[in-house]
């Protein structure tokens, strides 16, 4: 892992960006919200709120798969566009990656009317050119979880197979890569210059950027890290699955934005990581994530009306089981996600 060098007051400037524009007691917000919310942001390690927006409601939503990781905050932009925010690991980061209630998270967002999700996650870099504090827009996934995380809304007695060849939504990916330049948008300095947003078309010569999803909570051995590099892995985390799979089943467009914190364990030439380095990278990434999210929310509000529409209705025709043979209680459960698809 690399030890970064901060220049001047750049880190302090970045940290100040994460301060709320308004001091609001979230507990006192209304517990209901009328009207659909079409965009959601899921925050990962280091991103626990959207400080550039105006919170208007804080919702606790019960689903057939339990409760989400925490309350869902509805906030509005200056123009009044509503956005849902959910902290993946809970407000106090008390959920292990394997324990995140992903089915409840996605189901609750679906219930709000969400059509697209932009998810943030801290990752380790598997490639030299992806430096700590760089951001990555992955296009492919390799699943190295162990099967202990529930990864589908369907179950015994009701079988469906969602298409997952393109695990991230191509239209949402394009909206993000078109809106954010590879260089010059992300702030902060390290020994190699300003952070870069790595995308398939703009920085990777049209080649896929692949994220490895491991079970955790331990990090990779050096042998594993080198294996993932040999597979063409770009970055590694513990969170993209089953989140992306469940979003696809729920007919929600999904794209993860990865925030690099270190070089995983493959790079023996780098200095040992320090607490100062990790904290500095997380804070800088958090500030840039807030800036990036604010920009992308405005872009989605202006241009994202068609995103997710091509997924609507897709799961109705992905079912292999005749609905007439499905138990009523199971159909009622699926009605939460897909009202009107099958008679209850």
UniProtKB/Swiss-Prot annotation:
Can you tell me which residues bind substrate?
Answer: 238, 262-264
Annotated site location: Important for substrate specificity: 220, 275
Query: InterPro entries, from UniProt?
Result: MTAP, Nucleoside_phosphorylase_d, Nucleoside_phosphorylase_sf, Purine_phosphorylase-2_CS
Enzyme class label: transferase
Q: Name the Gene Ontology molecular function terms of this record.
A: S-methyl-5-thioadenosine phosphorylase activity
**Cellular component aspect of the GO annotation:** cytosol; nucleus
Q: Where does phosphate bind?
A: 45, 88-89, 121-122, 239
Which reactions appear under catalytic activity for this entry? S-methyl-5'-thioadenosine + phosphate = 5-(methylsulfanyl)-alpha-D-ribose 1-phosphate + adenine
Entry's EC annotation: 2.4.2.28
Q: Where in the cell is it found?
A: Cytoplasm; Nucleus
Return the HAMAP family for the record.
MTAP (MF_01963)
Q: What does this protein do?
A: Catalyzes the reversible phosphorylation of S-methyl-5'-thioadenosine (MTA) to adenine and 5-methylthioribose-1-phosphate. Involved in the breakdown of MTA, a major by-product of polyamine biosynthesis. Responsible for the first step in the methionine salvage pathway after MTA has been generated from S-adenosylmethionine. Has broad substrate specificity with 6-aminopurine nucleosides as preferred substrates.
Descriptive protein name: S-methyl-5'-thioadenosine phosphorylase
